[in-house]
Amino acid sequence: MSEAGGRGCGSPVPQRARWRLVAATAAFCLVSATSVWTAGAEPMSREEKQKLGNQVLEMFDHAYGNYMEHAYPADELMPLTCRGRVRGQEPSRGDVDDALGKFSLTLIDSLDTLVVLNKTKEFEDAVRKVLRDVNLDNDVVVSVFETNIRVLGGLLGGHSLAIMLKEKGEYMQWYNDELLQMAKQLGYKLLPAFNTTSGLPYPRINLKFGIRKPEARTGTETDTCTACAGTLILEFAALSRFTGATIFEEYARKALDFLWEKRQRSSNLVGVTINIHTGDWVRKDSGVGAGIDSYYEYLLKAYVLLGDDSFLERFNTHYDAIMRYISQPPLLLDVHIHKPMLNARTWMDALLAFFPGLQVLKGDIRPAIETHEMLYQVIKKHNFLPEAFTTDFRVHWAQHPLRPEFAESTYFLYKATGDPYYLEVGKTLIENLNKYARVPCGFAAMKDVRTGSHEDRMDSFFLAEMFKYLYLLFADKEDIIFDIEDYIFTTEAHLLPLWLSTTNQSISKKNTTSEYTELDDSNFDWTCPNTQILFPNDPLYAQSIREPLKNVVDKSCPRGIIRVEESFRSGAKPPLRARDFMATNPEHLEILKKMGVSLIHLKDGRVQLVQHAIQAASSIDAEDGLRFMQEMIELSSQQQKEQQLPPRAVQIVSHPFFGRVVLTAGPAQFGLDLSKHKETRGFVASSKPSNGCSELTNPEAVMGKIALIQRGQCMFAEKARNIQNAGAIGGIVIDDNEGSSSDTAPLFQMAGDGKDTDDIKIPMLFLFSKEGSIILDAIREYEEVEVLLSDKAKDRDPEMENEEQPSSENDSQNQSGEQISSSSQEVDLVDQESSEENSLNSHPESLSLADMDNAASISPSEQTSNPTENHETTNLNGECTDLDNQLQEQSETEEDSNPNVSWGKKVQPIDSILADWNEDIEAFEMMEKDEL
């Protein structure tokens, strides 16, 4: 399911076009297997590689020979009973049988494999059999998706290599595009499926009667999967380029355009199934496995084959979302498209094994190595990759139909790195197939990988893909009779020539008005990767990535619980306590993840904590996670009577600022209430010690001034008491997390220490690192800096008053917490301090992480002149919050002389906002029914 290469110099390419093809596809060349390899595995000798390659040839002969002897012209071989599987003559297997159309499926699917394996005589015989025996006008209902990738793709792959062999002058001299004519006939038979208002095809079609006729027995379906509708462009475009009939590519493009338009705009993810008439998402979970996988694959490969930049832009947008939400290295977990920080399930399916290969094509090697290694560890535990397995690597669905996706990714990782480790992985696959799946009449699928029981099936993709990738893994360039890098692999591993990008380009590229997400794609200036850049002077690079994952499966197994105290004595860090947790601390988030606790930023600006014990790194971590959640509930109970406070302002009033710089500050739940008392004005001075956690050693420096204190090491209230005792008239706590900012993080408020704080009489405010650095820089530049602590900006000079109207008092809305679920426990959470007490304000079962909405700056003129504009704010992860967040009162956070700076994101059209809002409402309603 991934790209083979792309030097663009295939034999069928005219010389005048060759340079254009090279220029168009050079970025997608996979480096040769002579690349730098990691020292973790000994290089495999040419003799051993040749031996393994010959073993693959023998295995193919065993499978293909038994199909031809015992099953042909049936679609597939039943290897346990040594007979063919004919539609209607065997008990129905449901949707699986929709791939069977009484068109000798396995033979067509195997055509180009014969050429790759250098079985040219057998290929010529097979083509003659297809032309003589195969009938495409059968009264049978088939899957549009499966028929496209297996039959249409097989015919086109066979045609591509037939004309290559004919040009070489030895074989196929009689061939006159007969396979192409069959492909065109099949293409026209599939076109009626696109007769929908959306342009998305029906999932099934009758080869003889089409759609919606009484005798068709199909056409009443309303839903299709995203991959089913989005995995057509390669085959349909190739058919158009080969024949000049543009209608096929046009229909496939229209389907892709519709899917792109229907993506969830805030997450840029797509669901699993969609209504083909309305475009509504039916299943709103999203991942890279079954139901979606090849949609992403075909966006990138369509760019390679067709050279249309829009496909690459779409892929990059989706890929950014995948890596942001779905990728949890080394895992790839499905999420909800409207709540992408919330996992939709706790298991993964085997089809995602193709994704590391696609990442190689993208040029993102590190996560490809990580996920591939995780999958390999699962295989070593179960001999094969189960159809689905849980996040702790237990079997969820025990079947294994001899899927080739893992072999595919193994091949492309070897091509990209030249690491002999992947040859050893391939050797393991060969050994397992022969040891556990081989039967006298072929290779049988595994009914249960735990018991080794078989199922009487050998799917056509086993011959189309598995043996192709395994042979290419061990073959040297001279072992293949053509240059494999002149072709692109379809999702069924059929070969389409890259020179099609310069042929019959009459189809105009649709000028879509859709906006693409601006992405920092600097990490992928090359695609595929140059190992000399990726592994500079470090032959152990790939091994260093794999090493931590070597025992990932075994470590997930249940084991006796070690006493926590003993683990502390052995040098392990104590578990994260709820009172120390800070939502903006990456280290804390990593600890939560290890404990199986997910921090989810919801669209309404709230934060949700969810614990899944099975996702914890170990049983001890799961226990720590449960303790953490219980502590959160206790903190909520302790702080329930505390009030939520609006943001405050720190205004620099000394020369040369004169009130022009106003910084958004977080309030304290103790000390002088600036909304009820006069503002505090004074010069600032740094405290010693900088964290203010002990008696100050420089009381003379802070006497009568506003003390600057570093966050951390003790409670906020303790800091306040220490600077108050030193004579300070106020305090500003500056965040110790470098880079934190009020325009990218929610408002933070400082809580007390659970004791009586009436003794604290001075005002205390909190500044994030970015805002705090402005004051520190001003001190370095001007030495004496005077600030005003207030509930809102005041005393601006006349020039500033002319530029900007006085800001209205900020209200703090929607600062109630979010539910946190741990087993049957639910609590509401608010922003908490690292190493200080949490701000907890709500009912007894609620806990606030103070105002999870950002303090954005919108000038009064903007608020009045554009009442319908959506000024999006940003949560901790940079994720856009939803429309209801925008209704929150926004505080001014100016840091320059322009008073009208808005920290909001770019404006969306109101129709788009309302459409996404309606989708979110539907998703929230549906979420109540989800099993999480």
Curated annotation (Swiss-Prot):
Q: Which disease is it linked to?
A: Congenital disorder of glycosylation 2V: A form of congenital disorder of glycosylation, a genetically heterogeneous group of multisystem disorders caused by a defect in glycoprotein biosynthesis and characterized by under-glycosylated serum glycoproteins. Congenital disorders of glycosylation result in a wide variety of clinical features, such as defects in the nervous system development, psychomotor retardation, dysmorphic features, hypotonia, coagulation disorders, and immunodeficiency.
- PROSITE patterns in the record, alphabetically? ER_TARGET (PS00014)
Which biological processes are named by the entry's GO terms? carbohydrate metabolic process; endoplasmic reticulum mannose trimming; endoplasmic reticulum unfolded protein response; ERAD pathway; mannoprotein catabolic process; protein glycosylation; ubiquitin-dependent glycoprotein ERAD pathway
Cofactor(s) required for function per UniProt: Ca(2+)
Q: Which region is the signal sequence?
A: 1-41
Task: Tell me the route in metabolism or biology where this protein functions.
Answer: Protein modification; protein glycosylation
Mind listing the UniProt keywords for this protein, alphabetically?
A: Congenital disorder of glycosylation, Endoplasmic reticulum, Glycoprotein, Hydrolase, Metal-binding, Signal, Unfolded protein response
Q: Which reactions fall under this protein's catalytic activity?
A: N(4)-(alpha-D-Man-(1->2)-alpha-D-Man-(1->2)-alpha-D-Man-(1->3)-[alpha-D-Man-(1->2)-alpha-D-Man-(1->3)-[alpha-D-Man-(1->2)-alpha-D-Man-(1->6)]-alpha-D-Man-(1->6)]-beta-D-Man-(1->4)-beta-D-GlcNAc-(1->4)-beta-D-GlcNAc)-L-asparaginyl-[protein] (N-glucan mannose isomer 9A1,2,3B1,2,3) + 4 H2O = N(4)-(alpha-D-Man-(1->3)-[alpha-D-Man-(1->3)-[alpha-D-Man-(1->6)]-alpha-D-Man-(1->6)]-beta-D-Man-(1->4)-beta-D-GlcNAc-(1->4)-beta-D-GlcNAc)-L-asparaginyl-[protein] (N-glucan mannose isomer 5A1,2) + 4 beta-D-mannose; N(4)-(alpha-D-Man-(1->2)-alpha-D-Man-(1->2)-alpha-D-Man-(1->3)-[alpha-D-Man-(1->3)-[alpha-D-Man-(1->2)-alpha-D-Man-(1->6)]-alpha-D-Man-(1->6)]-beta-D-Man-(1->4)-beta-D-GlcNAc-(1->4)-beta-D-GlcNAc)-L-asparaginyl-[protein] (N-glucan mannose isomer 8A1,2,3B1,3) + 3 H2O = N(4)-(alpha-D-Man-(1->3)-[alpha-D-Man-(1->3)-[alpha-D-Man-(1->6)]-alpha-D-Man-(1->6)]-beta-D-Man-(1->4)-beta-D-GlcNAc-(1->4)-beta-D-GlcNAc)-L-asparaginyl-[protein] (N-glucan mannose isomer 5A1,2) + 3 beta-D-mannose
**Primary place of residence?**
endoplasmic reticulum
Q: Where is this region: Disordered?
A: 790-908
Record's InterPro entries? 6hp_glycosidase-like_sf, EDEM1/2/3, EDEM3_PA, Glyco_hydro_47, PA_dom_sf, PA_domain, Seven-hairpin_glycosidases
> What are the glycosylated positions?
N118, N195, N504, N511, N810, N814, N900
What positions does the domain PA occupy? 674-779
Q: Name one GO cellular component term.
A: endoplasmic reticulum lumen
Cite the record's Low complexity compositional bias ranges.
Answer: 812-825
Q: Where does Ca(2+) bind?
A: T491
Recorded protein name is ER degradation-enhancing alpha-mannosidase-like protein 3
Q: Which domain of life is it from?
A: Eukaryota
Q: Where in the cell is it found?
A: Endoplasmic reticulum lumen
The active-site annotation reads E146 (proton donor), D293, E387 (proton donor), E405
Question: Known EC number(s)?
Answer: 3.2.1.113
